[in-house]
UniProtKB/Swiss-Prot annotation:
The active site is at E204. It comes from Mycobacterium leprae (strain TN). This is 3-methyl-2-oxobutanoate hydroxymethyltransferase. Its main location: cytoplasm. The lineage of its organism: Bacteria, Bacillati, Actinomycetota, Actinomycetes, Mycobacteriales. Its EC number is 2.1.2.11. GO terms for biological process: pantothenate biosynthetic process. One of its GO terms (cellular component) is cytoplasm. It is found in: Cytoplasm. Mg(2+) binds at D67, D106, E138. GO terms for molecular function: 3-methyl-2-oxobutanoate hydroxymethyltransferase activity; magnesium ion binding. PANTHER family: 3-METHYL-2-OXOBUTANOATE HYDROXYMETHYLTRANSFERASE. Homodecamer; pentamer of dimers.
Length: 286
């Protein structure tokens, strides 16, 4: 299949059948091309084969196996406790379900901070054992050496600046970053990760005006989460996007469904039909 003739931007609005769309395996070069052409794109998290397959069929070009699995899969309060051993099986499942999407794996807290050697060791595990197509790590200037080391080794890196959840304790909670005098440092972080070789950068909880400035300054795609409309792409945790998360969601989240309500209703109906001997019916039996 010729890559010149494929749709790499997701679902084609002119057709009702996603299956009919000519698609190719998304590479980092496609994301760069989309930025150059002014095409915005969406990224979602995924943590298992089944949801990865659904999102891939929906035309989502990039799936992130985020360390947010700490919260939505393992039930931790923050992303800090989750380990590489806990994330690797999730990456394997997502890779199997994503026939076209680029799969990015988050490097967990503590696995890359010691330096380039440690970063290369853990990133290699996610590429070899997990099958990830790229990795993501948090931080700006302070992790530029790690990013340069990984890219030199042939490992694509997605950076993450602004609010970095792994640093929630040192940042004093969930707070917008880059306001006032901190804006200069946020810009410096963005430039540093780009110069180190990152193929894209997530900007989380950054003021819209600053995110717009950075997006115009960088040649690599910017991915916003609470960073306004002018980023090249957007990302959300899928449970937040689909209404499965418990408790209050962040201001930057838009819920597109009520999956929790649908699952609850389905489970209740199933339990009631079993209790009342309605299920299984004759058509479900041999």
């Amino acid at each position: 299949m010729s890559e010149q003739n494929v749709n790499v931007y997701g679902a084609d609005p002119s057709t009702s059948s996603i299956q009919s769309i000519q698609r190719t395996k998304i590479r980092t070069k496609h994301l760069q091309k989309m930025k150059a052409e002014g095409h915005k794109w969406a990224m979602l998290t995924a943590y298992d084969y089944s949801t990865a397959r659904v999102f891939d069929e929906a035309g989502i070009p990039v799936l992130l196996v985020g360390d947010s699995a700490a919260n939505v899969v393992y039930g931790y309060d923050t992303t800090v406790p989750v380990s590489a051993d806990e994330l690797l099986p999730l990456v394997r499942g997502v890779v199997r379900g994503a026939g076209h999407a680029l799969v990015v794996a988050d490097l967990p807290f503590g696995s890359y901070e010691p330096g380039p050697t440690a970063a290369l060791a853990v990133a290699t595990r996610f590429m070899k054992e997990g099958g990830a197509h790229a990795v993501k790590l948090e931080g700006g200037q302070r992790v530029a050496e790690q990013i340069a080391c990984l890219t030199a080794a042939g490992i694509p890196v997605m950076a993450h600046i602004g609010f970095t959840p792994q640093s929630v304790n040192s940042l004093g909670g969930f707070r917008v970053q880059g306001r006032g005098g901190d804006a200069e440092q946020t810009v410096a972080d963005a430039v540093a990760v780009a110069e180190a070789g990152a193929f894209s950068v997530v900007m989380e909880m950054v003021p819209t005006e600053l995110a717009t400035q950075i997006t115009g300054k960088l040649t690599i795609p910017t991915i916003g989460i609470g960073a306004g409309l002018n980023c090249d792409a957007q990302v959300l945790v899928w449970q937040d996007m689909a209404g499965l998360s418990s408790g209050k969601v962040a201001r930057f989240v838009k819920q597109y469904a009520d999956i929790a309500g649908e699952l609850r209703r389905a489970a209740m109906q199933y339990a009631e039909e079993v209790a009342s001997a309605v299920f299984p019916a004759e058509e479900h039996c041999f």
